[in-house]
């Protein structure tokens, strides 16, 4: 296959994805985290009831101990961040994880720096081992 055709078929990262990958690159490079973006459809609440029409994207950084789930409700440009024990595409499971303050959810660089400093000093953040 021609290289330019292969490049056309590759997914193009969105602006949010680029910011996240830039800010959280230390997790990928130093702590063997894996990154993925998942489209979750319509948003549901902690009880599984309809909350808002999608699209709802989950940007996830995870390893065998922890998953940082950054949920983005695209139409409203709202963010919520939840920490769970493992990666999942189940919104109820994600939303029942540890919720991170909106101050950090809307400021990726501050969020990444807080995680980085905690991990460097204690090898954990919010009770989750890295």
Model regions: which residues?
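Intrinsically disordered, low-complexity regulatory regions enriched in serine/threonine/proline
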Residues: 2-26, 31-130
């Amino acid at each position: 296959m021609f290289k330019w055709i292969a490049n056309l078929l590759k997914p193009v990262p969105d602006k949010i994805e680029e910011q996240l990958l830039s800010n959280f690159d230390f997790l990928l490079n130093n702590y063997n985290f894996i990154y993925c973006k998942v489209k979750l459809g319509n948003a549901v609440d902690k009880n599984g009831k309809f909350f808002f029409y999608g699209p709802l994207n989950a940007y996830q950084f995870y390893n065998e101990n922890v998953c940082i789930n950054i949920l983005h409700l695209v139409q409203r440009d709202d963010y919520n961040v939840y920490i769970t024990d493992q990666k999942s595409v189940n919104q109820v499971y994600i939303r029942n994880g540890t919720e991170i303050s909106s101050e950090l959810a809307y400021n990726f660089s501050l969020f990444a720096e807080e995680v980085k400093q905690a991990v460097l000093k204690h090898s954990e953040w919010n009770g989750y081992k890295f």
